[in-house]
Amino acid sequence: MPASLLELKRKIASVKQTGKITEAMRMVSASKLNQTENRDKDYTVYNDHVRKTISHLISSQVVDSLRERDISIDKNNISKIDYTDVFGLGITADMIQPRKNIKTTGFLVVTGDRGLVGSYNSSVIKNMMSIFDDERAQGREVKVLAVGSVGAQFFKKNNVNVVYEKDGVSDVPTFDEVLPIVSTAIKMFLNGVYDQLYVCYTHHVNSLSSAFRVEKMLPIVDLDIGVKEAEAHKELEYDIEPDVNSVLMKLLPQYARSTIYGAILDAKTAEHASSMTAMQSATDNANDLVSNLTTKLNRARQAQITTEITEIISGANALE
């Protein structure tokens, strides 16, 4: 058999094997996607309830404080509130009160630990570099908490200040895995490492679509605190034991944990969806390549057979 035919056969066998591998990887990603997608949907409901509860608790205390001082309840007055007047000195007020003269912004950025996930990692990195440029243009220092080795390595190579990094998060992350990340993020904020913290990740929309998302985590503001007095009477009545500070001391760290865990779970779901799509595309390309190579092989065989028949006929004619 001519060398060209043998080479085509080897290529076909190699591409078929690659196609089997990518199809297996697609199936694994689909299985992981199914697990994280279901958990993500359930957890989103829980996280929304935690957020709503904290929003109402803070709002009710702010509204009561304004009432006691006969100050009108409007967004302008609410934006000027000093939360130490409402909650006293301590972690509760520190986690709620916006900082003045913000000099440093922290970003908790979630990427993956590996490639073969389409544009998942590159999209996050591209968006983050644009955000970093905007922050620096405003005279603010940027500090990054990187979850995922791809982002951490890229940022360090590009002279971004990475103050914390975490890799090896499970494909189906557990709540316990997130606790050290949350603890570090809160501690750095309270210690003044940064004046505000944003969580940046890829939000899973569906199997074919995702969206880059940036959420402010600390200080905990903009939780629908701007309520009307009528809404305050209707929605924000609480019987609190032993006191609001004690309740918020429990809820605020829970909110931080919920925000970060929800972001990582959502990001992992988007990563699995992107991986599944990428592997499906790779499998389809492998099948197309096998089809094209098989066509070339058949044509080469046909040409070889035609040549051999022509040679036989020519030889027979020469003997006559």
UniProtKB/Swiss-Prot annotation:
Major localization listed first in the record, in broad terms: membrane
Single GO MF annotation: proton-transporting ATP synthase activity, rotational mechanism
Activity control mechanisms: Increases 2-fold following exposure to low pH.
Induction and repression of expression: By low pH.
Any one Gene Ontology cellular component term annotated for this protein: plasma membrane
Gene3D superfamilies reported for this sequence: 3.40.1380.10, ATP synthase, gamma subunit, helix hairpin domain
Membrane protein topology class: Peripheral membrane protein
SUPFAM superfamilies registered for this protein in UniProt: ATP synthase (F1-ATPase), gamma subunit
Family matches, as Pfam families: ATP-synt
Coiled coil: none
PROSITE patterns named among the record's database cross-references: ATPASE_GAMMA
Alphabetic keyword roster: ATP synthesis, Cell membrane, CF(1), Hydrogen ion transport, Ion transport, Membrane, Transport
UniProt keyword Cell membrane present: yes
SS bonds (residue pairs): none
UniProt keyword Transport present: yes
Swiss-Prot/TrEMBL GO biological process terms: proton motive force-driven plasma membrane ATP synthesis
InterPro entries named among the record's database cross-references: ATP_synth_F1_ATPase_gsu, ATP_synth_F1_gsu, ATP_synth_F1_gsu_CS
HAMAP family the UniProt entry points to: ATP_synth_gamma_bact (MF_00815)
Family designation: Belongs to the ATPase gamma chain family.
Free-text function comment from the UniProt entry: Produces ATP from ADP in the presence of a proton gradient across the membrane. The gamma chain is believed to be important in regulating ATPase activity and the flow of protons through the CF(0) complex.
Assembly notes: F-type ATPases have 2 components, CF(1) - the catalytic core - and CF(0) - the membrane proton channel. CF(1) has five subunits: alpha(3), beta(3), gamma(1), delta(1), epsilon(1). CF(0) has three main subunits: a, b and c.
Official protein name in the record: ATP synthase gamma chain
Organism, as annotated: Lactobacillus acidophilus (strain ATCC 700396 / NCK56 / N2 / NCFM)
Taxonomic path: Bacteria, Bacillati, Bacillota, Bacilli, Lactobacillales
UniProt gene name: atpG
